[in-house]
Amino acid sequence: MEAEEAQHGASPPISAIEEFSIIPEAPMRSSQVSALGLEAQEDEDPSYKWREEHRLSATQQSELRDVCDYAIETMPSFPKEGSADVEPNQESLVAEACDTPEHWEAVPQSLAGRQARTLAPPELWACPIQSEHLDMAPFSSDLGSEEEEVEFWPGLTSLTLGSGQAEEEEETSSDNSGQTRYYSPCEEHPAETNQNEGAESGTIRQGEELPSEELQESQGLLHPQEVQVLEEQGQQEAGFRGEGTLREDVCADGLLGEEQMIEQVNDEKGEQKQKQEQVQDVMLGRQGERMGLTGEPEGLNDGEWEQEDMERKAQGQGGPEQGEERKRELQVPEENRADSQDEKSQTFLGKSEEVTGKQEDHGIKEKGVPVSGQEAKEPESWDGGRLGAVGRARSREEENEHHGPSMPALIAPEDSPHCDLFPGASYLVTQIPGTQTESRAEELSPAALSPLLEPIRCSHQPISLLGSFLTEESPDKEKLLSVL
């Protein structure tokens, strides 16, 4: 019996367990009921003693395990309702799990091991939510160990004490029970202290969230330089926002700058358009003044325009009186202008007629074709013409011998259709093919082709083109007469 007890370990007396002031009331009640049942059965069966001790140690271990597991499970989130409803279920589950012999061997038997187990789980070292601090409770054992301070959560003390403070804490913490937050191991940081100070009120302000920079700082993921850069960016954003609401008018300054630039560009364009319009108006006004002052812009040449411009400049320098007189002179009625144009045309026609007459006389003299009534006036001018006429007559005779006689036909001026337009001109027509005739007599001066407004009567006297051939020095005089 003693060997078996040594294997399973000596179970501490119940008084040592009762000294725990932190054990919940429900596990204590269950242990008391089990102890009473065991004492009633001691006298009935002598072999039941070992079973009692074994069962008592198992129950004690399960109770301690229940306390630790319950603290771990209830710490992250507090339910709205009391924890009394949850206790029976947890106790039954833990008791069933601890009845297996494999679990008995894994459980530490000494009280110091149990104390270490209560402090061993890493979840107990997690950062507390809001401003919950660990409670320090003195603990002393009957095995001669020194007094040690054990850290416990406020939830466990509230279960044992059952005071009204626990209920108040549960009510305040029930608002955040729906959101279970998990944090990294505790690190002393100013961000956490600020967060704890702000959370002492028991409520979290709506619309305010923990910035991502602070979270990353608390987790130790950001470099100090990056933190400074992020803080500067946050200050710049706050400056952009100004007096506006959250996420509203963030880029107000940038938009205002763009609008100002657009307005400046539009103003410059408007000024340029106004200047162009003014220049156009001035140019049109000057053109209108010129049209009104001159009165006849179409009838003037370039030289006349230049002269008038020079005169206007001189008048402008001379004074306003001369300018007014010039304007009066330039404002000529249309009738006077028409009369002046008619006079100019008549004088031009008269001059052209004189020129054409002179050219006709000069051409006839050069060709040696005398007109009737003018042979006796200038006998000296026919000397050169006679020699040329003799040479021409000889060439014609040679041509007649080779090609046959040619019959020149003189067209009377009465039958000529061009008699009215070209007076004093006769046309030599040769109808015999193969003959080459000279048409110098037919050539007319360009002055004769100019149109004449007044019809000129034709002279009905026939013009003899062969008069130059009838000279005393001509040996072929008879032949020429026979031909005629």
From Swiss-Prot:
One Pfam family matching this protein: ARHGEF5_35
Biased composition (Acidic residues): 299-309
Modified residues (Phosphoserine): 184
Compositionally biased residues, Basic and acidic residues: 266-278, 323-368, 394-404
Region: Disordered, residue numbers: 139-418
Coiled-coil region: none
Skewed-composition ranges (Low complexity): 217-237
Record's keyword terms, sorted: Phosphoprotein
Name under which the protein is recorded: Rho guanine nucleotide exchange factor 35
Native species: Homo sapiens (Human)
